[in-house]
């Protein structure tokens, strides 16, 4: 391989290492295509700078441990429902209709308890589904190595 192509190949490989993998989740009988965010880079990027999120799409943030979580909407351009799930994938907290934030200071949306999984959906989805605390989240697909 030519040395002049090596930097481009390395860049592409590094971007792929931080890309969110895809699968699906089911919540209250509704299935959503999902992107898994399992490392610091993909969790930090989240749904930033996206101009839309389909009604049947989501992002699932996966962490290695249970602890109180807090999300913010910095550079997120669309309102979201933020749902927090414990290690058993039971819904423990909801922050509904979290609004976009383009400049500091941005509001913080904390969980009300320990969470290992955080699901972001298009704002209004949780209400339409009639979600209640204790709901179970089913995950299909391999999220990859959680770091």
Predicted ranges, named:
Residues 1-6:
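Bacterial N-terminal signal peptides that target proteins for export
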Residues 14-17:
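N-terminal signal peptide c-region/cleavage motif recognized by signal peptidases
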């Amino acid at each position: 391989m030519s040395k002049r192509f090596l930097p481009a190949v390395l860049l592409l490989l590094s971007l792929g290492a931080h890309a969110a993998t895809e699968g699906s989740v089911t919540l209250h009988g509704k299935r959503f295509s999902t992107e898994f965010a399992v490392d610091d880079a993909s969790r930090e990027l989240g749904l930033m700078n996206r101009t839309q999120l389909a009604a049947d799409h989501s992002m699932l943030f996966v962490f290695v441990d249970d602890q109180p979580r807090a999300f913010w909407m910095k550079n997120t351009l669309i309102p979201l429902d933020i749902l927090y799930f414990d290690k058993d994938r039971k819904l423990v907290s909801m922050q509904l209709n979290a609004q976009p934030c383009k400049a500091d200071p941005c509001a913080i949306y904390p969980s009300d308890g320990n969470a290992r999984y955080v699901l972001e959906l298009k704002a209004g989805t949780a209400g339409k589904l009639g979600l209640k605390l204790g709901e179970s989240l089913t995950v299909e697909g391999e999220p990859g190595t959680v770091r």
